[in-house]
């Protein structure tokens, strides 16, 4: 029986990666662009109902809600090949459509004004589920809508559905290059507070690493956002394969999260994927032979990680879950795990087991790939704190000069004082300390 997941897409980035995610799922499940099941899709071993429901005319419709404060991106999606896939009642674009002006406070205030409409959609989707497991939020934390409206959604979902899991796929800005959004550190910090306090699990995707991986695989200096989003949709579909092609383990969100997050604060996950194939990213470099060991070893290489972190000497894994798709023999997996342990490819926390968990999953029978095995690693690693430190440093530099604060003071949340900034900074500083404490052998007795 499917445990359903409702996907919430907020802002430009959230809707763009969401659009490619749904295209990927349709291809994997043999669903046509208008939601009808293709005539060849007769295998019947998959659970489509986790992410789709069937309408009265038997079309498959995504359990998705598309929200944006300016219409361009959503209108592009609706006029595209897959435009008729979505339920039109689940699309919310604000009437005047001016966007949030890359301002967290603007996005947050906007969300308060349209809160009833958003909640009506969410409640309707939740009521239409037999056994709702949780929500998946797709957004970026640098702009206005994804960070501000996304933050508001996280808080309200937590209040309204306290027992449901909230997972996010959060795109972090490229902090290594000059941004076109000068207030990005403010937006990121304010959103990070909500990701820390109101989400159960955050899959961190970072534009710098995505651009680097796309450039490396495609031999191109400047990969487009479309190509980077394809990497994201590949990661998202791979991270949900065990839900859609269930096996004995990891066939619901709660079991995946339980194996990865031993202490609730440290719930920010990084991902690696290998190999990217021609179908997923055109003209990608082909890897000639894929064995289970080869895939598991490659997943541990920093260059395949979708987050650019600065590990210190003490940085270590808290936990790892490898999802291996394709023809994998459990005996090979066991041998590979022994080899990885012998060769010390990965260093783990000193106070817990050195556990790499492996979930074997089927591949979609409808997509032909030129390799036997592919793998996704979801990992909890203490070096993720370096990403938060970067955000904090950039925030401190802006805040010291009180730069660009006037835009924020126009909104109700900052009208009287700037306490919200200070409390967000405290939460993120505590989060960094928590990850650093994990590197201490005495963590459990601290």
Curated annotation (Swiss-Prot):
GO biological process per UniProt: cytoplasmic microtubule organization; meiotic spindle organization; microtubule nucleation; mitotic cell cycle; mitotic cytokinesis, division site positioning; mitotic sister chromatid segregation; mitotic spindle midzone assembly; mitotic spindle organization
Compartment annotation: Cytoplasm, Cytoskeleton, Microtubule organizing center, Spindle pole body
Disulphide bond pairs: none
Keyword GTP-binding on entry: yes
Binding site for GTP: 142-148
Keywords: Cytoplasm, Cytoskeleton, GTP-binding, Microtubule, Nucleotide-binding
Keyword Hydrolase: no
Any GO molecular function: GTP binding
Record GO cellular component, one term: interphase microtubule organizing center
Superkingdom, taxonomy of origin: Eukaryota
Gene3D superfamilies per the UniProt record, alphabetical: Helix hairpin bin, Tubulin/FtsZ, C-terminal domain, Tubulin/FtsZ, GTPase domain
Main localization (coarse): cytoplasm
Subunit structure: Interacts with mto1. Interacts with mto2.
PANTHER family in the cross-refs: TUBULIN (PTHR11588)
Family (UniProt): Belongs to the tubulin family.
Protein name, per record: Tubulin gamma chain
Organism: Schizosaccharomyces pombe (strain 972 / ATCC 24843) (Fission yeast)
